[in-house]
Every structure is written in structure tokens, then in C-alpha cells.
């Protein structure tokens, strides 16, 4: 079938298998050009492994360090001529490329928040890897059913204590708009922490440790975004910020647990990139469009693979890791360059409907958004029929 992009709001409801595969190959090629990751991990579990930063971590570990990988994700398979999700096709392509290079790859498809998927993952580690020496936590979901209580918690993107008016882009109409966000209630804050805080990461590490599948010296990291002044009202100072603070508290306990066996636990702070999640946040398309414009002009623009490959080489396995005062690994230094942030702030209120394409890189933002779903990738013929029914080998469901 011939597959074209169909966008509804902040979701593209179609995905292109060949485009997703080409995107994965591009990321692999980037890692390969940088050469081997010295003293890198050899057996890696990635929780949230099918898109964005989690996929980039799996690619960097496998094709940079030669690691065997086990990826956990929750994706929809193609069925009845309906394409699967982008994460499904990304993972299928990863398996194909890993197999071609003799790299062990196993994947588990299901709800990473559940006890069932944790148990299936542990069984797969025992069977295929024995133990893991790196656990990357990159799960991103709007809701979580708690495995012990059965309660489903829904995360909320709201300020705390007062309403906040945010500038942004109505991406459907390509117009500047303002959104008034009301403050979160105590229950909404608690629910957001339950979904996006550190509890599930801790549950994973506790389960892996109790099962004896964490190697001595094992490391774990959870990915997060903090941002700077322009995004603080809804990130660090909002409901999501409370979840991020919970992550910072959780990592201290995990670090103590792993340090006893020569290991480590860190929160890794990454730069803002286009994801399905970020595109749904009222101010982020405008912020990203301005950030792209400024960073591309300076030659410092990076995407997921550049960020995570650098994180592994420079900090997780580097001799001189970039660590902040709270003990987090920082890969967002170029975004937070004072000159970059000052220029973004300077332009923020100047953007109008008329100059959207000149003052910002909204065109680049839209292109990155479509790339998430396999569209706009160099070398792919989008007028040619493509087979949507792609399977993932070694898949556990």
C-alpha cells in the first residue's frame, strides 16, 4: 500500500515502515561514524526502547558498544492493512540491523508499569543475557495503572499555585495562540508524580536486583528534561516538576543500593527535542521552533541520537562525566548556553502569525515531527507501495 502522512492535532495517524527503518539506519550510521564506545556496556536493558531517547540509547549501546540489548516497549502491531505504530517499525528495523551484525536483541511488548512485564523481562534476561550491566529507564506515558493498587493515575501538565498564560503555536492552523493553564489540584499533582516520578524506576531496579539479574557494577539512568526560564512554569515549577523532584529523590536510594556492589544510578538531563509528548505541550512547538533556529545558526543543534551517544561516551562511560550540583548527568549544556537562551527569550514575544516562518524554524519543527512517523526521510520513495505487515523477531508479548 502507498502510505502518506495524515496529521490530526499532535498525532500523525499513519506511519511509514520504510521511513522508520531508514531513520533507524541513519542513527546507526551516526554512531558508527563516531567509532566504538570505550569501556561501554555489554548487556543492556532499555525500558521504553522503541522511540525517541530510549531508541537512541538502544542504538548507541548496540552499535557503539557492541552490547546485547533487551528492549521493553508498548506498541501496536500492524493489522488488516492498517499500519502499526512508529515504535513497532523502529523496533523491527533495529532487530534486522542487529541481526545483520551478529548482535543479540530481544524485545518485550507490553505495559512496563505492570508486574507481569517485569517478570517476563526478568525471565528473558535470565535466558538470553544472564545479567545486565546497564538499565536505561525511558518510559513515557500519560497514565499508569499501579501494579499493587490497580488504580489508574493520569498525569497532568499544569502550573502549581496560580494560573499561567503561555504563548504557543496552533500547529493545525499555523498561528500564534495563548493558552491559560489553571493550577493543578493536590490530587492532580499526586497523580502526576505516580505516573512520571521515580516509583516505577525503583520497582524495576528492586525487581531486577531481587531476581539476581543485575551484574556487579551495574549502572542505571533515567532520562528527564529540565529546561530553563522560559519553560520553568510548566516544567520545574509545575505538576511535572514535582514528578521530576521525586525522580531526584528516588535516584539517591538507587545509587546507595547499586554503589554497594560497585554500581551507580543517575538521572540524565537531555535537551528539548520533538516527540509526540512534547508536541502536545502548549508552549513547546514555539520553544522548539525558536531553539532550532538559534542552535542551527550556531551549529550546535542536536537530536536524540547525538544527545544519547554523547551521554554514553562523555558521562555514563566517560572519564570526566558532566555532573551538576545535584549529581545529575547533564547532556543539555548546549541548549542552556546563556547566549542561546537569551536569544530565544528575545525572540519569544516577537513571533507573530506573519513572521512565524522567518523568526523561527517552524518548518524544521514540522519536518522533525513527521520524521517521528517515518516521513520526510532522505532516500525513501513515498510514492512506492510498501508492505505494512512487518514482524519483530524474538518478540515476547
Swiss-Prot record:
NAD(+) binds at residues 48-53, 74-75, 111-112, 139-140, 244, 273-275. It is an enzyme of class 1 (oxidoreductase). It comes from Burkholderia pseudomallei (strain 1710b). The keyword Lipid metabolism applies. Pathway: Lipid metabolism; fatty acid biosynthesis. Belongs to the TER reductase family. The keyword Acetylation does not apply. NCBIfam families: EnoyACPredFabV, PRK13656.1. Its EC number is 1.3.1.9. Monomer. This is Enoyl-[acyl-carrier-protein] reductase [NADH]. Substrate binds at residue 225. InterPro entries: Eno_Rdtase_FAD-bd_dom, Enoyl-CoA_Rdtase_cat_dom, FabV-like_NADH_b, NAD(P)-bd_dom_sf, Trans-2-enoyl-CoA_reductase. Keywords: Fatty acid biosynthesis, Fatty acid metabolism, Lipid biosynthesis, Lipid metabolism, NAD, Oxidoreductase. The gene is fabV. GO terms for biological process: fatty acid biosynthetic process. Involved in the final reduction of the elongation cycle of fatty acid synthesis (FAS II). Catalyzes the reduction of a carbon-carbon double bond in an enoyl moiety that is covalently linked to an acyl carrier protein (ACP). The active site is at 235 (proton donor). Signal peptide: none annotated. PANTHER family: ENOYL-[ACYL-CARRIER-PROTEIN] REDUCTASE [NADH]. GO terms for molecular function: enoyl-[acyl-carrier-protein] reductase (NADH) activity; NAD binding; trans-2-enoyl-CoA reductase (NADH) activity. The record marks 75 as: Plays an important role in discriminating NADH against NADPH. It catalyses: a 2,3-saturated acyl-[ACP] + NAD(+) = a (2E)-enoyl-[ACP] + NADH + H(+). Pfam families: Eno-Rase_FAD_bd, Eno-Rase_NADH_b, Enoyl_reductase. It comes from the Bacteria. Coiled coil: none annotated.
